[in-house]
């Protein structure tokens, strides 16, 4: 278990999003089953926390950008700052939609669901433009892709809720089934490649392990997600009688898996909260005592052999560096052995 690799590849932005979605789905299922009688404004509290962190992070990042013009000449700084602004714009539109949903459910002050879904209708074309910009600048935009491909699904759901169309929910979700079919093909692709790599002797163990991990991750995400959607559609069409909590269980499995995968995803915009560096380096500078734990790795298979090997007393072990930064700060691993210095020798001179 290499804690250094876990911290280096951690993506805090995605972890926050998946954690908020998981907590929101738990509260929503309990509210729909009547187990809790909270207001929907309270049920949406994890969503408000998510959007609040986005707004605060973007505000701090913009302030750092405005007060430090010298940072704008550093590599891909301008591209990352523009990507942050695009993400903030999309999140504000999503926040508007979520506020309208709560207002419609609590007070019914908005007569039509089409008006509630209007922010999502604006999000889709903006997301398409953001995806084009992201492809040109080699940026990963998962949220923008998700919003851009679901425009037809948003329209069908709004029409169904307003009673303009009387289709069953199984037909209303046809765009969703098309998207899930594509994801199932992706899962099949990873499974096939994993099997081929397992049977090939020319592939190194690291590549084989990576493809197997990807295949298992995609299966654990897509299969429970598809199960949740099928159960939800049958529940809405009155073909499934149990409560909403069993329906949401597969969704929780997918979200927990997504949270675990954030520890192996590099990336993240460095301009959130103006930290301008990887989240791991930021934590190590903010909390220096974490360096001792971040530099530890365990190898249970070679523990006995390592114990049998003794280093010479007069030989100073070389300590590999963990991070190298332009500022010249180097964080080194803690040495595995410490040697007691020899006692002080006193020589009495004869009279």
UniProtKB/Swiss-Prot annotation:
The chain crosses the membrane at residues 16-36, 41-61, 81-101, 113-133, 154-174, 178-198, 212-232, 244-264. It is found in: Membrane. It comes from the Eukaryota. Its main location: membrane. GO terms for cellular component: membrane. Keywords: Membrane, Transmembrane, Transmembrane helix. The keyword Transmembrane helix applies. It is a multi-pass membrane protein. PANTHER family: FAM11A, B PROTEIN, TRANSMEMBRANE PROTEIN 185A. Belongs to the TMEM185 family. This is Transmembrane protein 185-like.
């Amino acid at each position: 278990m290499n804690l250094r690799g876990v911290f280096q590849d951690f993506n805090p932005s995605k972890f926050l999003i998946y954690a908020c979605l998981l907590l929101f789905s738990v509260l929503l299922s309990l509210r729909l089953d009547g187990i809790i009688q909270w207001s929907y404004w309270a049920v949406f509290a994890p969503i408000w926390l998510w959007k609040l962190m986005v707004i605060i992070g973007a505000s701090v990042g913009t302030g750092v950008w405005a007060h430090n013009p010298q940072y704008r000449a550093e590599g891909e700084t301008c591209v990352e700052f523009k990507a942050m602004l695009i993400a903030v714009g999309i999140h504000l539109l999503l926040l508007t939609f979520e506020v309208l949903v709560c207002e419609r459910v609590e007070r019914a002050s908005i007569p039509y669901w089409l008006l509630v879904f209007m922010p999502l209708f604006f999000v889709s074309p903006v997301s398409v433009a953001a995806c084009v910009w992201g492809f040109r600048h080699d940026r990963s935009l998962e949220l923008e892709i998700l919003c851009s491909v679901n425009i037809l699904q948003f329209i069908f759901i709004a029409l169904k809720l307003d009673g303009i169309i009387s289709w069953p929910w199984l037909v209303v979700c046809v765009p969703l089934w098309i998207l899930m079919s594509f994801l199932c093909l992706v899962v099949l692709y990873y499974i096939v490649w994993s099997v081929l790599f397992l049977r090939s002797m020319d592939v190194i163990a690291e590549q084989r392990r990576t493809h197997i991990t990807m295949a298992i991750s995609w299966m654990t995400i897509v299969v429970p997600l598809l199960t949740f959607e099928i159960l939800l559609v049958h529940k809405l069409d009155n073909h499934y009688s149990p409560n909403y909590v069993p329906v949401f269980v597969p969704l929780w499995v997918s979200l927990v898996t997504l949270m675990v995968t954030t520890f192996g995803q590099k990336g993240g915009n460095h301009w959130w909260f103006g930290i301008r560096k990887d989240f791991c380096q930021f934590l190590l500078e903010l909390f220096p005592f974490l360096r001792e734990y971040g530099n530890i790795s365990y190898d249970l298979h070679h523990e006995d052999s390592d114990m049998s090997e003794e280093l010479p007393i007069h030989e100073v072990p070389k300590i590999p560096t963990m991070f190298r930064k332009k500022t010249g700060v180097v964080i080194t691993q803690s040495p595995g052995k410490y040697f007691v210095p020899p006692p002080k020798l006193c020589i009495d001179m004869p009279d």
